[in-house]
Curated annotation (Swiss-Prot):
Keywords: Acetylation, Eye lens protein. NADP(+) binds at residues 218-281. Gene3D superfamilies: NADP-dependent oxidoreductase domain. GO terms for molecular function: oxidoreductase activity; structural constituent of eye lens. This is Rho crystallin. It comes from Rana temporaria. Monomer.
Amino acid sequence: MTLTKETRVTLNDGNMMPILGLGTYASPHVPKSLAEEAVKIAIDVGYRHIDCAFITGNEMHIGNGIRSKISDGTVKREDIFYTGKLWCTYFSPEMVRKGLERSLRDVGMDYLDLFLMHWPVSLKPSGASDPSDKDKPFIYDNVDLCATWEALEARKDAGLVRSLGVSNFNRRQLERILNKPGLKYKPVCNQVECHVYLNQNKLHSYCKSKDIVLVTYSVLGSHRDRNWVDLSLPVLLDDPILNKVAAKYNRTSAEIAMRFILQKGIVVLAKSFTPARIKQNLGVFEFELKPEDMKSLESLDRNLHYGPFREVKQHPEYPFHDEY
């Protein structure tokens, strides 16, 4: 199948997700206003899939950007596929509605196209909420993931969410949701870190077998935010083999890294606040990697997580103790 910026994948609930989306995470020192401008530019050049999360603290700016492009007639609300995420401190069933409604209020929408459980680890709101919160410890909670899922299903029934999914779940955790007695809605996707150094082949194969779409963040090897990433790790885009393939196609290493994942049938979220790069990333639809180059890039896998969220490594639901 020829891939274009208009290509969408059909989710297991019948809704459609664009195969390329704009990631909007920004490290704390980056002005939140840049996210708003990035969204406007992305929509102008053809992006229709915008991914955000409560924990990034910029949903209000993302919403401003989307609404401005609706107001000027560039798009209609139904043209946009917007993803939000329920943070780990909102996993108690009685907190799920509050977490969702806060995102709806911040982004200024009546509904979200997709709402994800951000990580499979429940945290108590009285402790730290993310790794940049240095003044508090993380306080683990023991909320049953299935109980959170049931509360999310109720929000879908209420019309506040079109599709439900998960993020950073391993196979065992996915199976727990899928095997839940009385399950009403399967997760439509699992959003995970995935790139040439972490190709996620086993998890991808499992998800496909269950009609769950794999979506990738950090496709370019992640931002270099020391709150989340070990800065001693190699810079993915400097990889010699990746750059050799890029030279062969007269493309950037970023374009090759994204095209590799897209050709594997995985939805890609490309994060950038730089106008030129936002436009350049659409170049992934202008070429196709040959089988021998796909094979060469497959060989780069080293099971490397740039963002393993080690701060919760002792949590009983920490996902990366399992193989996949």
